[in-house]
Amino acid sequence: MSDASLLAAAPLPSPLQALVEAGLAQRQRGYRGRFAPSPTGALHRGNLRTALLSWLHARLRGGAWLLRLDDLDTPRNRAGAETSILDDLAWLGLDWDGPVLRQSERRGLYATALSALRRQGLLYPCRCSRRLLAPISAPHGATAVYPGTCRAASGGWGPAQGRLPSWRLRLEPGRLHWLESYGAPGELDGPAAVGDVVLRRADGYLAYHLATAVDELVLGISDVVRGDDLWSATGAQVAVMAALGAAPPRYGHVPLWCDGGGRRLSKREGAEGLAAYHQLGMDAAAVVGQLAASAALVPAASRLSAAELLQQLSSERLDQVLRGAQA
């Protein structure tokens, strides 16, 4: 989970503690995976392939596969995106267990966890603006490790100059660990590679890392299969789980689908989704075949349903292919 020196677990309110304990007990009873897209647009073929791999990983192990919509960042959500996501998954035959979960309907749960961390002294207010932090931004636009500018500041939690602070999780020296099935080894230096992550933004929105960490625990998620672009986000989520006194699930970070130039497919760059396949007259069997072939699970030009693909594979074969893809 993490080195003992990294942070101390926060005492949780009894209702939240009960939910976390129930989730961890659920994890022990059997496999529970999840797919968690954000409704910021239609799923592109890279998202769809990751969904297929996650679904296969769960079903080949006789496990449950939950569908959670990470829709907390409401300004980025797009009208019709949720319906599109659900329709696309159903059309491909990727069935999920239980009702669709929406993070926007679980804000109270995340706020309770945030309050517990604050009471324990594991958070501090940060008044650094994006402009102030711009010089330490990575070249590709991601924010580099926060330098701790406000860590020792004496500012309060209220507004100053009309602006509320963000809330950061205080990480002490130590390393973060998680079980990793496919990606790079699951170990990071907390302060050097992760830093004091924001759990509540200055605009009042609860942060992705907080909500994701709480959900993995409370929902009893045992295995997370997702794109390897999220490997670097795992450390922050593991740190939050450690602060809440719980171990993380097992992770499997799988390769992303890249275009001919080696660039990963993205919504921002207009990567094609199912609409493009529909325009070509491709049915679900042809699309599943192409998605599976791109991951080296079947020969090129294969035609088969998701259920037929499931019958052809074993968990050992899937593991072998995904581990080989990372070699």
Language model feature labels by segment:
Residues 59-64, 219-220, 245-246, 295-302:
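Short helix-capping/linker segments at secondary-structure and domain boundaries
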Residues 1-41, 158, 174, 263-327:
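Non-catalytic terminal extensions that flank enzyme cores
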Residues 132-267, 273-278, 323, 327:
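Active-site cores that bind ATP or allylic diphosphates and position pyrophosphate for catalysis
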Residues 115-118, 217, 278, 292:
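Alpha-helix boundary recognition
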Residues 66-73, 253-255, 303-313:
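Short alpha-helical "patches" and their helix-cap loops
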Residues 3, 81-193, 303-327:
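Active-site neighborhoods of enzyme catalytic cores
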